[in-house]
C-alpha cells in the first residue's frame, strides 16, 4: 500500500452559508460547499454521495445531537427522542472534487466530516459576532451568547432548526 509521509487521508474544506434569527436563536443553514481531494477516484459519483452523507451527519451532530448525563451516568437512553436533523432542514450541498487521477487513492471515508463543526462555528461567528466552541450549537446556546452581548432574545426552552 502506498502512503505518502504525513498524508494519511483525503483533504476536505467546507464553506457554510447560514442565517441566525437573533430573537429565537434559530439557525437556518442555506448552503454548504465541500471541496475534497481524495487522489485518484475510481467512482467519482460514489465519492460525491459519501461526502453528502458526511455533510448531513456532521450538520446533525453540530446543531442537534448530544448525549445527556446525570449522576448515575448516561441519561439519554431513548433513541426515539434523540435529536437528529430531518430532510426538511437539509441545506443545498455542493461537492467539488479535485480531479487528481495521477495521485494514489486516499479514500473518501469520513474525511469530509472533519472540518464540519469548525466551519459551522465560524459561520455562526460571522453571523452573530459570538464564538461558539462547543457543539451542539443549539438555539438555547445561541440565545445565551447573544444575550451576553446585549442582543434581545426570547426565552424558549427548545426551538427546532429550520
Residue ranges and their predicted role:
Residues 3-162:
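C-terminal catalytic domains of large/alpha subunits in multi-subunit enzymes
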Amino acid at each position: 500500500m502506498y502512503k505518502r509521509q504525513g498524508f494519511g487521508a483525503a483533504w476536505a474544506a467546507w464553506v457554510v452559508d447560514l442565517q441566525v434569527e437573533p430573537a429565537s436563536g434559530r439557525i437556518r443553514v442555506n448552503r454548504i460547499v465541500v471541496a475534497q481531494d481524495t487522489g485518484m477516484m475510481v467512482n467519482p459519483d460514489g465519492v460525491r454521495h459519501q461526502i453528502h452523507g458526511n455533510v448531513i451527519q456532521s450538520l446533525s451532530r453540530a446543531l442537534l445531537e448530544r448525549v445527556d448525563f446525570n449522576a448515575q451516568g448516561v441519561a439519554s437512553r431513548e433513541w426515539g427522542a434523540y435529536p437528529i436533523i430531518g430532510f426538511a432542514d437539509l441545506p443545498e450541498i455542493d461537492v467539488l472534487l479535485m480531479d487528481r487521477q495521477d495521485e494514489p487513492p486516499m479514500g473518501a471515508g469520513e474525511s469530509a466530516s472533519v472540518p464540519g463543526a469548525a466551519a459551522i462555528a465560524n459561520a455562526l461567528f460571522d453571523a452573530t459576532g459570538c464564538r461558539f466552541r462547543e457543539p451542539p450549537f443549539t438555539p438555547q446556546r445561541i440565545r445565551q451568547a447573544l444575550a451576553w452581548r446585549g442582543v434581545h432574545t426570547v426565552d424558549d426552552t427548545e426551538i427546532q432548526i429550520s
